[in-house]
Amino acid sequence: MSFSKKYPHLFEPLQVNQMMIPNRIISAPLGSLTDKSVSGIGMIIRGTSGSVPGPRSRMAPGSYCFANMQESQKVREQVVTIQQRGAKAEFELCHVGQYAYVQPGDYAIGPVGFVREDGIEVKAMDENMMNEVADAFAKGAVDAKEYGFDMVMLHFGHGWLPTQFLSPHYNKRTDGYGGCFENRVKIPIQIVER
């Protein structure tokens, strides 16, 4: 049996709101987009760990982020290449929270404060920090639209900052952002609503 007969819907277009994706094959933000864009994939996701603008959002230095304006022309060219070859371009926004790569003397942020094994301080986020992070996600989404991306994905998995708030393992807060699920989900909801 042929692949297309075994999975007939895989190669059908998919309507998402006003956007039509040419098929249901979506590529994660890994590897070379040039190779992917000639392969017939319906949507190619770009982004990296810590793509939300800000000094404490990245997993490693040099992460793919709009905050680095030297990348701007390269990003626009990549989006155009993806779209010219018939695929849709999606940008993945994520913030790594307590796992952030920071400069010596700086700190990471998370639901609770502690010192990591590498000696980096993680500061418990106050409401101002929470608002700054939600604003940074919103700015990243606006930037993605300005760069020509067709869609934005908010990456709340892999233990990144929103998941750190959702998880009772990481979130030991005793205020209105910890404890029951309704409290722990407040920051992810705030990010989505921005």
Model-found features: residue ranges?
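Flavin-dependent oxidoreductase catalytic cores
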Residues: 1-194
